[in-house]
């Protein structure tokens, strides 16, 4: 389904409350290596997604021009917030022994919250644009990748805003237990091929993504679907590649830094324990599928 789309109200909350009161009265914020299992705790208080630096409250009316105007108005702010958050959040992971952090919390309301970040390196690729194009290919075809790699039934509805500038889409995913989850997402991509002083001054690419809170035209269906919200950021940077004997010259290394906050809302309909567990287990699966898709696409072109 492809229709034109635009947007209407946005409020940005730029501060993040980091004081988490756990059952033991302790704060949480530990990172794990790639091989370590993610932590999951019961919390009595969790910094709401509304206070996350990557989150902007976005409400959509039925008017296409208003929808578009609001998204375009917040685009640059979203890109800047994404870039600066990644620089601050992923700095502690910039070492071989610590490239991944995944913290999960179950709220008193029964929601599952996940705060995570990771660093991936695509070594010996042709260019920054090659990896950026692979990221955008995944974004434009994610329902195919999710269906193939997760074995779920995925459907994506596209509400075009501005090609290569702003994208709005809804993804509906049904797992093997017959439980359906939905996400309504807006994405702001940009490739700074020549660099920009506001984004580090060196060539880079930024992708800021956020959830839609309310949509008068395409409302959530909480009595039938589990709502999945995500406020995430991706930054790509490029560096010189050291070739091995079998490689030619002119290749580069592209580093992807990702961070975000995700929430699975408590289902408002009957659901089996197995079905709910599968939904919870898949909270970060989309990110893993993205990396697999990008690697496959980039290295098949070498």
State the predicted function of each range.
Residues 25, 29, 35-38:
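Long, leucine- and charge-enriched amphipathic alpha-helices
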Residues 13-15, 19-24, 31, 46-302:
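Eukaryotic helix-grip
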Residues 2-12:
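Eukaryotic low-complexity, proline/serine/threonine-rich intrinsically disordered regions
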Residues 5-7, 39-43:
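Intrinsically disordered, low-complexity regulatory segments of nuclear proteins
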